[in-house]
Design a protein with these regions (language model features):
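A membrane-pore/channel beta-structure motif
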Residues: 20-22, 30-32, 96-98, 106-112, ...
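Outer-membrane beta-barrel porins/channels
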Residues: 92, 112-114, 140-144
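Solvent-exposed loop/turn segments connecting transmembrane beta-strands
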Residues: 20-35, 48-60, 72, 82-91, ...
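Short, hydrophobic/aromatic-rich segments at coil-to-beta transitions
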Residues: 19-22, 41-46, 75-77, 109
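Cleavable N-terminal export/targeting peptides
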Residues: 1-20, 134-144
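Short loop/turn motifs that connect adjacent beta-strands in outer-membrane beta-barrel proteins
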Residues: 69-76, 101-106, 135-144
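Residue-level signature of outer-membrane beta-barrel architecture
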Residues: 37-39, 64-68, 84, 96-100, ...
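Outer-membrane beta-barrel "beta-signal"
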Residues: 64, 120-144
Length: 144
């Protein structure tokens, strides 16, 4: 499974020239640090690492997500992916990104993800998200 994750990561590097890079932290009983590429304002792939663990137990998770509802201050997404090591198997995330500030690069997220494998778990998480580069949706112009 790790070989497949590496292949997908290198394939995503090819589209990174037209993608927006971001980072996220998912706080839960199974926390994750994520690195993502957002492509064409509708798709994003996220590679997640499970911190707070020994290296031999480090869990890798890769998800491909589609943004179903894309508004100025929030978006709703869902996807599918896989997870290695701890709770190995299929991952089905669904969540909301909220961008409440004028700077739409920084925001918060809430996510529920089904982890399906030998043991099935429903993981709920919340956290922060930051997108590098230009804003995806410009802030509304204020009349003076």
């Amino acid at each position: 499974m790790k070989k497949y994750l590496l292949i997908v990561v290198f394939a995503l590097a090819g589209v990174s020239a037209s993608a927006q890079f971001g980072v996220s932290y998912h706080q839960s009983s199974i926390p994750n640090l994520g690195f993502n590429f957002e492509y064409q304002d509708r798709y994003f792939a996220e590679l997640r690492f499970g911190p707070n663990q020994y290296f031999e137990h480090l869990a890798l998770e890769l998800t491909a997500n589609y943004i179903f509802l894309n508004k100025e201050d929030y978006d709703f997404y869902g996807g599918i992916g896989g997870r290695t090591t701890q709770l190995e198997g299929l991952v089905i995330p669904a969540g909301v990104n909220i961008y409440p500030f004028d700077n739409k690069n920084f925001g918060f997220h809430i996510e529920a993800a089904a982890l399906l494998g030998e043991t099935s778990v429903l993981r709920g998480s919340w956290g922060i998200r930051y997108r590098f580069g230009g804003t995806r949706i410009p802030s509304p112009q204020k009349d003076e």
